[in-house]
Structures are given as structure tokens and as C-alpha cells.
Amino acid sequence: MVLTEQKRKSLEKLSDKNGFISALAFDQRGALKRLMAQYQDTEPTVAQMEELKVLVADELTKYASSMLLDPEYGLPATKALDKEAGLLLAFEKTGYDTSSTKRLPDCLDVWSAKRIKEQGADAVKFLLYYDVDSSDELNQQKQAYIERVGSECVAEDIPFFLEILAYDEEISDAGSVEYAKVKPRKVIEAMKVFSDPRFNIDVLKVEVPVNVKYVEGFADGEVVYSKAEAADFFKAQEEATNLPYIYLSAGVSAKLFQETLQFAHDSGAKFNGVLCGRATWAGSVEPYIKEGEKAAREWLRTTGFENIDELNKVLVKTASPWTDKV
């Protein structure tokens, strides 16, 4: 992979001194509303969503190399970032049309790579739902869409992070045993597709290739993969791309995510960091809604800090610098 000088500078801004991307993800919109709604009777307000993002940015970006935010509710938080922290902004609309299994990609209406760059971002992030077994017609439509985003990022000379969420059009429950059995192929084959230089992607943000809750030694109930099988899937994922790739936390607990990173490393995965979201900050939602800003800050300074500090310690032992790949 060849980087322009500007893209290299931007990636360095998003990384720590080791060349790892230890980024805090808080571009959640629909998921944040649902989390907040658990603790109050009224619809979460824009002001509440904006304020919590500001609090998390203010309290935790001093311990992260960068932060991912959304332009809908996250712009005030971009002003609260630690001066050393890089900024990624999400380009996609939240969620997808549940009346169809197509999960078509869609950019935010009044945003572009140019506007994201003008906002001070060091990278554009775009989320794509992708089923490698969908019709060629549907997947060509999705690929063309990603080509457009990639070309915009080339024009603006800004790094393009593609987040791939694999799914199966026939299986509605991504947490099921049924999906766990097909997940490795879905994740790995999608990574192969989008490693093609035609997409102009600089970093892939991906899921781990297994549902860890069904791995021998991690599973409480049914086991879908032995430890050896799971390790082979991590190896296959490593071989699937020549691009830097980072893991998303997919809403699992902080402890399970840390254990997963260790397992990935031990299996031979040379991942280049993480974009960790709810595993770090989700616990701040309840004190924020029930008790307000002060209680949320207290949670972030204690448990939130512990989550991110533990994660950073694990990263030092498990991640590889992205500079090895460029």
C-alpha cells in the first residue's frame, strides 16, 4: 500500500507513538438513542446526545490516539478532543432500511469528504453492510458506492476507513449459532473484496472473524468453534488483506474484547489497533441519564478510564504498527 505524504501525516495523527490506532468510537446515533431510552420515559434529546459525546471526548481522549464521531450529534465533541488526539468523522447515515434485506449504503445528505475534511477530520469513516452471498447485482451496486467514496477521499487527500459489517440476508439474528457457523467466511471474503486497490481504502475496520461467545474456552453454552478452528480463522483473516486493519468492539464487554485481542495476537493476527466504542463508554449512559453530568464524569474518570487503560495495555502486547504495511 502506498500513501501520499498528507495521508501518512493524517494516519500518524490518528495513531499512538507505537504506530497503533487506539481509537475511541462514539459515532453511535440510533444505538445511543436506544441505550438512553432504557433509563428515561421521554425520547432522548439532541442536547443529551451531544452532551454525552462531549463528556466522553473531554474525559477519555487524553488516553486514546483518536476519536470517531458523527457529524449529526458529534460536532460539539470535536471541540473537546485532547490536542494530541486525531479525529475521524462518519460519513454514513445511521442504521439501515429494515423493510428489505439489502441494507444499501447511504451517505449523510449534507456531507461530503470535502466537508468532513473542512470540519478538521483526519479521516473519513464509512460503514458498509455486506453479504458476500448476495446477488451480484446488489453487491456490484455496493461496490460502486464504495468506489465513489474512495474517489472522493483521493480527491481530498484524506484517509478512507471502511467499516465492514458482514451479514447474511437469510439469517436475521447475527448472534445466533446459525450465523456463527457462517460468520468466518462472510467476514474474511468481504475483506478480500475491499482490499482491491480500486476502492482506495487505507484502513479496514472489521469484526473479528468468529463470534467469540461460541469459541471453546470462551463459551458459556454451545460451542461452534474449537480453539484451533478459531485460531485458523484469525490466521485466514490476516492473510485476506494487505491493508492495515483494526478491530471494532461490536458492543461486547471490555473484558471479553481484551481477551479476544490477546487470542487474535496469539493466533497470528497482525491487526493494527482498535476502534472501541460501547465496550469503553456504555456504562456512562445510566449515571448520565439518572444523575447528570457530574455522575457521568465520575464514571468516565474511574471505570471509563480503567476500560481504556486496560485496553491500551493489551494493545501494546498484541497489536502491530500499521507502518509495517505501507
From Swiss-Prot:
Q: Does the keyword NAD apply?
A: no
The pathway noted for it is: Carbohydrate metabolism; D-tagatose 6-phosphate degradation; D-glyceraldehyde 3-phosphate and glycerone phosphate from D-tagatose 6-phosphate: step 2/2
Superkingdom of origin organism = Bacteria
EC primary class: lyase
Q: Which InterPro entries match?
A: Aldolase_TIM, DeoC/FbaB/LacD_aldolase, LacD_aldolase, Tag_1.6-dipho_adolase
Which terms are listed as keywords in the entry?
Lactose metabolism, Lyase, Plasmid
- What turns on this gene? By lactose. The operon consists of lacABCDFEGX.
The record lists the catalysed reaction(s) as: D-tagatofuranose 1,6-bisphosphate = D-glyceraldehyde 3-phosphate + dihydroxyacetone phosphate
Q: What is its EC number?
A: 4.1.2.40
- Please provide an example of a Pfam family that matches this protein in its UniProt record: DeoC
Give GO BP annotations, semicolon-separated: 6-sulfoquinovose(1-) catabolic process; D-tagatose 6-phosphate catabolic process; lactose catabolic process via tagatose-6-phosphate
Molecular function in Gene Ontology: 6-deoxy-6-sulfofructose-1-phosphate aldolase activity; tagatose-6-phosphate kinase activity; tagatose-bisphosphate aldolase activity
Concerning its family, UniProt says: Belongs to the aldolase LacD family.
User: What other remark does the UniProt record contain for this protein?
Assistant: This gene was sequenced from pMG820, a laboratory-derived deletion of the naturally occurring plasmid pLP712.
Looking up HAMAP family in the UniProt record yields: LacD
PANTHER family assigned to the protein according to its UniProt record, in alphabetical order: SULFOFRUCTOSEPHOSPHATE ALDOLASE
Q: What is this protein called?
A: Tagatose 1,6-diphosphate aldolase
From which source organism is this entry? Lactococcus lactis subsp. lactis
Q: The organism's lineage?
A: Bacteria, Bacillati, Bacillota, Bacilli, Lactobacillales
